[in-house]
Amino acid sequence: MQAFGESKKEAVKSGTDKEKIFSFNTYKSYWKHIKYFIKYVQEKYPKCTTMKSAKKYVNEWLQKRETEGMSAPTMHLEAKALGKYYGISPDDENYYKPPKRHRENITRSRGDAVRDKHFSKANNDELIKFCKGTGLRRCELNAIKGCDIITKTDIEAEISKLEKIPEEKRTESVEKRLDILKDTRLFDEEYYIHIRRGIGKGGRERYSPIVGKNADQIIERMKDTPNNKKVWEHIHSCADIHSYRGDYATMIYKAHARDIKDIPYDTINRGTGRKMQSEVYHCKKDEVGKKLDKAAMLICSKALGHNRIDVVANNYIRGL
């Protein structure tokens, strides 16, 4: 089941991805929620002593969790965790169907939370500025070292070196490396933080531009940290990292977004025959009517370490 470091793309091609977990963080999350299920079975059905015999209680447990008011994202996580363990795929008739996730019901980093009362913004000012200027996840903040800062000049030098390799002689890893490096051409910033493979979500590698009015302070901290030392030895558990990523995402979107009226009408709706803007994203649900620039959303998505613009629209960009 554990396939850390393996290529998920190749596993999908070979049809072996359903039985594998490619990210250690995903494994930890799944195991955490599976243990909740185990505890439930042990307490309610003490005569059930094996995971095989406990399988019949999966849907009962998930129904209980939904009745208790668990959020839709948590329900999806628990259903996936137990589905992965027992080999129950989402298209299986026995797979528990969690409630749909709606943007308007997301509470994470929306408004004040109890934990905010235990977090001093003044004492953690540098951390907050660092997060808002880099958009890193908590796991990435915990992992980056002094050696993980790089300039656009150095990135372009590596691109030039790799492009000298004849295309017919380039390996798949070289082509992938080139794609990652070339993503930095979407940005104008000179300094980037290198998120190495295996650190971020899904193990994806990327270069996040350092942006905003506190960029110099962030760069200075990175440069002042020895190459083999962590930039942040301690990150307050109550720091709202997701909220700071939202600020970072919104800043990048605003820097690259075109005025909606300036985006060309470049396609025709087959049903109505009316001209349409293919590069305009139409928000849904509680934000219906809002329009966003798809090109700017993609740039924002790359900086955050995502590959889907709808994730950016639903979870990060705000206040527009």
Over which residues does each language-model region extend?
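N-terminal DNA-binding module of tyrosine recombinases/phage integrases
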Residues: 1-18
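C-terminal/domain-terminus segments
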Residues: 52-56, 210, 217-225, 314-320
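Non-catalytic DNA-binding core/recognition domains of DNA-processing enzymes
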Residues: 16-91
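Flexible interdomain linker/hinge and immediately adjacent N-terminus
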Residues: 59-63, 67-68, 87-116, 199
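Short, charged phosphate-coordinating catalytic segments
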Residues: 131-187
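Basic, Lys/Arg- and aromatic-enriched nucleic-acid-binding interface segment
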Residues: 110-138, 283-284, 291-297
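C-terminal catalytic core of Y-nucleophile DNA break-rejoin enzymes
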Residues: 168-176, 199-223, 227-248
